[in-house]
Amino acid sequence: GVACRCDSDGPTVRGDSLSGTLWLTGGCPSGWHNCRGSGPFIGYCCKK
């Protein structure tokens, strides 16, 4: 999948680790949670 930035990854600055996985539809898979808060963001940033 495509990596995305979780809220816990820090501000969007070059060199940040992207610990989430992008899911476009249907929310996060079972056993995962959305690790990204509100904001202009397409899909869900999910993390185990």
Swiss-Prot record:
Single GO cellular component annotation? extracellular region
Going by the entry's taxonomy, the superkingdom of the source organism is recorded as Eukaryota
InterPro entries the UniProt entry points to: Anenome_toxin, Myo_ane_neurotoxin_sf
Kindly list the places in or outside the cell where this protein is found, as annotated in its UniProt entry.
Secreted; Nematocyst
Q: Which GO terms describe its molecular function?
A: sodium channel regulator activity; toxin activity
Q: Which GO terms describe its biological process?
A: regulation of signal transduction
In this record, what's one Pfam family? Toxin_4
Alphabetized UniProt keyword annotations: Disulfide bond, Ion channel impairing toxin, Nematocyst, Neurotoxin, Secreted, Toxin, Voltage-gated sodium channel impairing toxin
Cystine pairings recorded for this chain: C4-C45, C6-C35, C28-C46
What is this protein for, i.e. what is its function? Binds to the sodium channels Nav1.1/SCN1A (EC(50)=165 nM), Nav1.5/SCN5A (EC(50)=103 nM) and Nav1.6/SCN8A (EC(50)=133 nM), thereby delaying their inactivation. Also inhibits Nav1.2/SCN2A, Nav1.3/SCN3A, and Nav1.4/SCN4A, but to a lesser extent. Inhibits Nav1.5 differently from isoforms Nav1.1 and Nav1.6. In Nav1.5 the effect consists in a right-shift of inactivation; whereas in both Nav1.1 and Nav1.6 the effect consists in an incomplete inactivation.
State any further remark.
vDoes not show activity on Nav1.7/SCN9A.
The UniProt entry's sequence similarity note says: Belongs to the sea anemone sodium channel inhibitory toxin family. Type I subfamily.
**Protein name per the record:** Delta-actitoxin-Bcg1b
What is the scientific name of the source organism?
Answer: Bunodosoma cangicum (Sea anemone)
